[in-house]
Amino acid sequence: MAGFNYGDYKKKERDDPESKYELEAYATSEVPAYLQNHGFGTMAPSAMADNALVDALNSIRLFQLWFGALPYGRIAITQQPEFNFGQSWPTLVYLPVSAFLDGTQRWSLLGGNAFRFAEFIDEVTPHEVSHQWWGHLVGWATYHDQWLSEGFADFSAGLFLQATEKKQDKFDQYWERARKTILEKNQFGQSANDAGPVWMGLRLSTFRTGSAYQKLVYSKGGYVLHMLRSLMWNPKTGDQDFIALMHDFVTTNTGKNASTEDFLAAVNRHMRKDMDLEANGRADWFIREWVYGTAIPSYRMEYSIAPADGGKVTLTGKITQSGVADTFRMRVPVYLDFDGNLTRLGSIGLIGNQTAPEFRVILPKKPKRVILNAHHDVLAAESVVSGN
């Protein structure tokens, strides 16, 4: 199998000493005929090739940090005529013509829908570039394991948004959209998650759940990795444990078709002590629940804040998990909002439908808000907070 683009292309090149990569961007000097026929014949995708080149460069730099270096040394970003379709081959990425148009041009084409379509444009380049790792450098063993490609690519697009946006908003909105994609009911009263676990892959799609494959293998698969990153976050070293896991998984499986169990083996090598919710030194529970299972928890936190000595305050709270089996395990984080800056206070481990023991913490001052699951750290049906 081979991939290629054929046409009258303009080429732009850039050598990046930081990533040690040669980047090329190819775009046409005119839009496809179907756009010319709608009065947009003067648009020139090649004039916007720099934007695609910069997004690809930033993606390569970011993902080499998180996943490790690539062996290829070059990548070509190429425009193809479809408006909303991208695809990746080793060293060759197809991007839709829409990715080579600026916001004004997209507004001319789409009107008010341009704002919604902008989300796709923001995400398509990092998603497709990340397939240089997920799908090419590391393959997948069977259809059961394809979430290791598409889910990991969706996670990578989220990383890109977090790294390139000044505020956290787009990153949080990205995972909220994913949550709704997974859980919202269709016209038959069924959600994608009702179709089955991520592990079922292509078999998820039926007459009543036609888009379940896309919504689970891509969106929920990405969410699995997002949750794992949150579980492995360390207040002293940040994401370093998770980054070490991802480097290990890539190094161990380069040139191989990895399975879900291969990924679990890497997780078990790098798991934090507070992830040992079955007291067996393993994180099998996490993959069992989120890749092989379909349970979606709900959370409720009740808290109170009272004055303490020295101008400080005492935060007292309790968290309840519900809507799951008695064996379902998870940790959910609590955040504090001090003047718009979120601080992660810690996480609470829960098993089954239960209320965890009450926690009590002395704080230097009263927070503006106490937030549960602030960055969609856990895929939840709801995360409700009440208190003063």
Language-model-detected regions and their locations in the chain:
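Active-site rim elements
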Residues: 42-50, 141-143, 208-215, 249-254, ...
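Short acidic/polar inter-strand loop motif in beta-rich domains
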Residues: 374-387
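Amphipathic alpha-helical substructures
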Residues: 214-313, 317
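Acidic/His/Gly-enriched intrinsically disordered linker/tail segments
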Residues: 119, 150, 154-227, 253-254
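Zinc-dependent metallopeptidase catalytic helix centered on the HExxH motif
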Residues: 57, 61-62, 112-180
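Beta-strand-rich binding/interaction modules
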Residues: 237-238, 279-280, 294-373
